[in-house]
């Protein structure tokens, strides 16, 4: 199965899928799925965006995609980031927020199906670590606190069988960054995500949030941190064999281009 993992896009859906298709062309493949690590930019109403989003790129492309009912060019699974309309996501019925765009809720898993060879299981914990909210139940969080994941969400996942990929927004505790806005050598303190990897033993973990490309090994699991949209290291391609431990990194998309065929 051919999978493209993508970093934070903050509403730049047009650019994401332009780059995904260009990446396919460069590799000479067609992706079966796109996996997204959160900060997708789910803002159905541009008037509801949070302060950080308002100060940067605004609501982005999602409101128009939603209004027009656009179809994701490739089946896409995403977890929430820390900049989304959490109330809208919580109240949304069903898996798909748009045709082909699947929201993987915290503490849940989804099977990526291949009609010829079976399925690959993806487990997800979106949002970022918040020390003051971590011990609360997820259904107790209100407003902007919903950007945080909670211990009970992790506990719902730890006994899930046969997980191949873990998709998180924040970096598992222990991931060290050579370059980071908090300074070189910054180490993630996102509790619980490292424990989740210890229990699930997936083949690989993808994360975003920190807007930098980084590789790490946590609890014996390969962890790949992805850069933000339009930056080198935003897209990574892997091939994963169903029913085995085999997977390989096919390449990374490094070209930075302007414009969009979806504008």
Predicted features along the sequence, with ranges:
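Core catalytic region of metal-dependent phosphoesterases/phosphodiesterases
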Residues: 6, 13-114
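Active-site-proximal loop/helix segment associated with metal-binding centers of metalloenzymes
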Residues: 115-183
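Active-site neighborhood of phospho(di)ester-bond hydrolases with catalytic His/Asp-centered motifs
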Residues: 5-7, 33-39, 74-83, 104-105, ...
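Conserved beta-sheet core of the metallophosphoesterase superfamily
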Residues: 75-79, 94-99, 174-246
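Active-site environment of divalent metal-dependent phosphoester hydrolases
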Residues: 10-16, 41-46, 79-90, 110, ...
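A short C-terminal boundary segment appended to hydrolase-like catalytic domains
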Residues: 242-263
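Beta-strand-turn-beta hairpins that frame and shape the catalytic cleft
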Residues: 1-4, 109-124, 165, 217-222
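Active-site-proximal segments of metal-dependent phosphoesterases and phosphodiesterases across multiple
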Residues: 41, 47-66, 161-201
């Amino acid at each position: 199965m051919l999978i493209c993992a993508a970093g934070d896009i903050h509403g730049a859906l047009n650019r994401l899928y332009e780059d995904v298709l260009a990446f396919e062309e460069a590799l000479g493949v067609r992706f079966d799925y796109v996996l997204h690590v959160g900060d997708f930019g789910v803002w159905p109403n541009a008037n509801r965006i949070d302060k950080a989003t308002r100060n940067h790129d605004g609501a982005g492309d999602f409101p128009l995609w939603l209004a027009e009912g656009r179809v994701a060019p490739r089946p896409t699974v995403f977890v929430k980031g820390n900049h989304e309309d959490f109330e809208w996501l919580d109240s949304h019925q069903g898996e798909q927020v748009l045709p082909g765009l699947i929201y993987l809720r915290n503490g849940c898993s989804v099977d990526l199906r291949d009609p010829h060879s079976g399925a690959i299981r993806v487990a997800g914990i979106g949002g970022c670590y918040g020390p003051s909210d971590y011990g609360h139940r997820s259904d107790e969080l209100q407003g902007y606190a919903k950007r945080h994941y909670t211990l009970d969400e992790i506990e719902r996942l730890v006994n899930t069988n046969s997980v191949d990929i873990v998709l998180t927004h924040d970096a598992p505790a222990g991931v060290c960054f050579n370059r980071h806005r908090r300074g070189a050598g910054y180490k993630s303190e996102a509790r619980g995500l490292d424990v989740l990897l210890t229990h699930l033993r997936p083949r690989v973990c993808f994360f975003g949030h920190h807007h930098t490309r980084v590789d790490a090994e946590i609890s014996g699991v390969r962890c790949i941190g992805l850069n933000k949209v339009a930056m080198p290291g935003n897209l990574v391609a892997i091939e994963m064999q169903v029913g085995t431990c085999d997977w390989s990194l096919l390449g990374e998309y490094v070209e930075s281009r302007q414009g969009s065929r979806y504008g």
